[in-house]
């Protein structure tokens, strides 16, 4: 599956700014794993108050980097 197909099939249904729960569902991992990735900088994010938000563009960058490694 190429990068464009990932975007069209997986991430197209999600909003441009995603919650931890939405990010978790998109990646197929637990929210605990997403929190770890956000805290250690694996996925770029922004904090709104006490909540993390993940711009879809940052999630796409993460996926692109990891697809290149695979």
Where are these regions (language model features)?
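Short Lys/Arg-enriched helix C-cap and helix-to-coil transition segments
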Residues: 46-52
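Basic Lys/Arg-rich amphipathic helical interaction modules
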Residues: 1-36, 56-70
């Amino acid at each position: 599956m190429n990068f464009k197909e990932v975007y069209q099939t997986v991430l197209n249904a999600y909003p441009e700014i995603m919650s931890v729960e939405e990010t978790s569902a998109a990646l197929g991992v637990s929210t605990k794993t997403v929190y770890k990735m956000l805290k250690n900088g694996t996925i770029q994010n922004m904090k709104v108050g006490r909540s993390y938000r993940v711009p879809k563009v940052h999630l796409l960058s993460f996926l692109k980097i990891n697809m290149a490694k695979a």
